[in-house]
């Protein structure tokens, strides 16, 4: 019996001899490189403010733990807060909220409690948000 090493990455299933996930990742990264994000301001005080907001906002995390939160901010002030057990889903909820409400991403900051994956960074770029924390 032949053993094949199979791994998962942020873009799906990757097999060593046939790596469509890698090709897809390269194509996606190349597409994102050409995106021009607006210049944005970030102040240290806003980072402290966002951290305070996300850590004290009434949430499932405070009740149960093991929940990822994302807050969309403008100049450190929360505009939208979402939670999900999946950190990618929390980002997707922000994207959906922005779409439904016609929110201009140019002056926004996305702050997330989850560790950042390549896919989350790419999603943020595609959303047009210039700052990801």
Residue ranges and their predicted role:
Residues 1-69, 73-75, 80-81:
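Intrinsically disordered, low-complexity regions enriched in acidic/Ser/Thr/Pro/Gln residues
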Residues 6, 22, 54, 67, ...:
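Weak global preference for isoleucine
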Residues 21-34, 72, 85-90, 96-97, ...:
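Generic alpha-helical propensity signal that fires on short helical segments
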Residues 43-46, 50-53, 66, 87-90, ...:
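General structural feature for long, well-ordered alpha-helical segments within catalytic domains
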Residues 61-114:
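Glycine- and Gly-Pro-enriched alpha-helical subdomains that act as flexible
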Residues 101-133:
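Extracellular/luminal Protease-associated
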